């Protein structure tokens, strides 16, 4: 039954009682008046006590006030009606009756609250509920709990009412006026609980004040008048009705006072009475007459709190970012709501700081009347000292935790504690008892049978303006008229209290930002063993002063490791406050305790913040009396959990004054920043009741310690006892493990890799695995991951601890899991592995014997020395043979002996220099296995063979650098067929190509060689294929076939071979050199070659380039002709006799070890030229210096170094040695050495330059005849044409023809002499005049580099046109770029200083090549202008490049044209090769597509067949089923014929019905079955 229904039932009962008893004796008017009055009284009481949406939540005080008002009303009515028959006894009875009625209504309301929890939710102002309301009903509750009331009118009063009807009717108007006048006086106590000292006829109406906790609303405000309908029940109006509309009820106080308006009749002399019936009598009356309904009053018994299961101890986890620990709700005015619900037992004593003293009538602010009465009565019996009591301070405006939900707190025995003090201005204190944690959700209002209350503490301190005065008031319903006076006094007290709170609310608004929520607490007495300390009460309170307190810093937030809803664990710091014996004259030590309300749990989580404060003045005087706990260091007093800013941390010492001490210099003695202490009070009486013993809980340790956060139970949880061994407390540091720990780590890694290791790699999570009792069984968990982290971080001091932790992992697993569990078995297997490997860890491995480092070095150096010695011997023989041959060739021609005396000795092979470089002795010059010109085609052929043999090793080493496309099986088959068709003379070359890559095993002499092309790699196959193609194209003459593989790159790659392969190669080369060197003649330059020794080349990095070892000033030996003609640029070259016997063979066959351009001495060509520049296609006039040997390290603007990789073309890489400096004394200054592989014939000619059927037009300068010299290798170079080289000032032309024409040569000499007469130059300053003698030239030694990427040509580079169509045009300006077999090769010859040399080496298949110019722009003023009569000389577009004499440049340009043709041919070959590869790829793709299509068709066919098969099977199955059905139908037909109608089987009947249903038309009539009725036997 809801609250409203209960109230309506009570009203109906009372209406029926009064109305039906008065029907026989009174008229309708009197009954109407009586019922109206009675309903009005009940209505007023109901409106006061109701806690639904029509009553203010603070109705407890209003109800209490209404009781007092009723008494005062009765008192006033009795004083005005002294002539009444009943007198004061009736008045007393009326008061008692009203109190009883109110109590019954309250009981009903409280019962309704239990069933209807939404009462407080529907209230608009739940923040101002006065919790003292629930205690009013306890006084007569026991007496009234078993009494049911039935109201009726007295028979005598009804008779008197009937006799006085006429008189009452006559005087009705007059009495009504008198009643209305008296009504204002009678109803005054109902509308205002006014103070007796200041009575007024029209007192002010108290309105609802939401900021007050005790404000009540008793003003009735309704706009509806009293209903006059007798039979209808009055509806409940709003909260109140105006006093002018209320019916006159109790007293009609007229002048004669002879008649009194009563409930039954207006003329009744007696007051209607209410008889109290026992439940038995009420039941009997209800049974006798249906007019009476017995409604028993049943009180709900208080539910006993169920015993909760034991809480699981849990480890608290500190977390900064968990939800805030307290809830703060504010009103519209910005004030904090005091959300203390009306269901708590704990009375809240509120007081706000008031800056102005209050009058004595306004100082009763601290207690609630009923509670204080109980405390006052119990005070004398409790004067002895008790253990410390926990006291909560709740300042107005903050929420009391865990009260808004209507949950009942844990009941405590009635132990009121009253600390009274004299009436002096006191500090505003808000004191409430600390609430205990409870899971009960019952409201305290439902616990009416318990009259016990929690201890109440009234604290007053004489420091501020308001005083706390306790006024005990005893309410005894059975007492005499003195009770009325006490009730009136209590009314005045409550009014003062309301006014005080109303005034304090205004102050609270101003100081809201400075108020904090604190809680006074005592130390945990369970941990104190000293009885003396227990007896000494420690009252630790915190008083806030709004003018000095800063807002409290946010507390640390915590989160449980597990669920938040299982239990409510209080978080406390390990360091707690310690109770200190406080003598009466000593100041009170203060601590602050912040009470927070968790948003989720709404639990009372209180964090004790110990701030042991000592007054500065008194601490010095009484420092002896303070226990040593007060002088704890700050780091113990201020635990790390507090998240306060540094400036807000209390200094903890008496010597550091705070802001409060600076501002408050008055009589109050302040302490640290967050506390203010009370002064000494000598007459303070402390009455503290001993708190009830709670369930034993582990308290925090007594002495503050700096430890991690623990739960309130002191960290008894096994989660907090997890083994810390092996765990790093600090961050893991970089630790260098000792050998024994390294072995431990290896053993641990072995355990990690074991197949049974996964369960032990990480820590056990009981909640994830569903083993919640794991930590009950396992006290010290451990896992391998933790052990590894600790081991790496240096967490283990000894190996025994490591072993102990490892064994702990296995023992834990075996302890928790039974022996049949797989984890137990896995742990056992891992433990076996550990125990087997751990002894090995303990055993120190024997240290290896110390190696003699010196001995190793000696052995290594000795091996290197042997290899170098062998190579030197072989190269000496090679050089001596080639030099002798060159000298003999020079002696054959008398015309140019002087000019080219040293050309043969100075010309050297680029490939041989790559392979090895000789180290000079004192003169320190280079020779790279110099190869010189041969006198005949046969000698040139043999020499080229020698050069190719020396370069074979480099080709094999560099083969890996070039990535060729994969050779297919078809290509291998085709290559094998082509090799079979080759002549027998070419087979040694094929074998040599294969031998160079060590692809064939060692063969015995004379044995048959079997070549399996399928076993060779692609590199060898590509070389063989290229060799075969060259033979087919006529590029390789049979008489000059090489015995080596095509050379690809420099010799730096040869060093990658091991020593054994080098030795074999060296032996092979020596044999070939000895065989090829026979018959060669010695030349006059043997002295030059014998004057220096060899140096083995050492590969250096790309960036280093080649370094000039030495260039002496005497290394240029000019001929007598050059000396007489002032060393003109024109040096006549005798092709193939003086220096270039092998030039053409080098270009075609890569067999020459010579440089095809023998430099003439150009030092004396120009007067202003000090620099000797040897560039890509030019060299200064060094008649005897090979083009690759004269190197200096003058910086160049673009240092292009790119060596050929596998294509063996000198034009494929350009070198610049400007990065390096000469370490020798005779270094020439400002030499710009740009060495291009195009100038240096390195055994690479065979693979790139094929001068087949090329017509090199050499223009004879005297006769102006174009003599075609065909470098046709297929014709063995038998075409002897004009092979004379004309050397201008800037161009050293190297003729590449094998045969020589003496007549033409002599003509060239004459022309050169004419040029000499025109051009007179002086030797460079760096050259001594004595050096121009016939001394042998000492070429420098060159250290070559590995391949370097080509650099772009700078803007100062001259662009030469190599287009053969421009050989007869004078203006050929555009530079042509051609591509090699694998990449583009840009040929941009750089004309820098004076002479131009051709690039005698063929074009390789290497990457982009450019010929760079030096940084210094060559001078052009000293160069002779071109001859205008020659139309065929090429022109130069670059303004920085010099001009050349037209009569001497034809042969050079023809050479470049031929080279350009070769590049084009190579490009064509490359394109063809790419086309072939593309076709192969397309064919493969087509084959793959065909295969995929074939597979797809096959899959479709398979699917189709499977589908057809399924269809056939389904058809067969269907036919079978149909046949079975047909047979069944036939059988049924036969059975039907055999059986009669009356003997039809059930199956047959069902079949008939089924067939009928199948055949029936859907639109036809429904099936009507006539069923035989079954006779019921019953």
Curated annotation (Swiss-Prot):
For bias kind Low complexity, which ranges apply? 18-35, 164-185, 197-231, 352-383, 396-407, 417-433, 604-653, 660-686, 881-911, 918-961, 1047-1061, 1112-1167, 1205-1218, 1231-1334, 1370-1386, 1400-1424, 1432-1451
Any single GO molecular-function term of the entry would be: lysine-acetylated histone binding
* Residue stretches of biased makeup (Basic residues): 1092-1107
Q: Which domain of life is it from?
A: Eukaryota
Q: GO terms for biological process? A: chromatin remodeling; regulation of DNA-templated transcription
Species whose genome carries this gene: Dictyostelium discoideum (Social amoeba)
Name of the molecule in the record: Bromodomain-containing protein DDB_G0270170
Q: Which Gene3D superfamilies match?
A: 1.20.1270.220, Bromodomain-like (1.20.920.10)
Domain NET: from-to ranges: 957-1039
What's a GO cellular component annotated to this UniProt protein?
chromatin
Q: Which residues form a coiled coil?
A: 479-506, 851-903, 1113-1150, 1280-1308, 1462-1544
Instruction: List every stretch annotated Disordered.
Output: 1-39, 108-127, 151-285, 319-454, 543-565, 580-730, 874-969, 1039-1167, 1184-1452, 1480-1544
Q: Supply the SMART domains for this chain.
A: BROMO (SM00297)
**Residue spans of biased composition, Acidic residues class:** 1-12, 1192-1204
Pfam families named in the record: BET, Bromodomain
Query: Which segments constitute the Bromo domain?
Result: 735-841
Q: Bias regions of kind Polar residues — which residues?
A: 319-332, 340-351, 384-395, 443-454, 1356-1369, 1387-1399
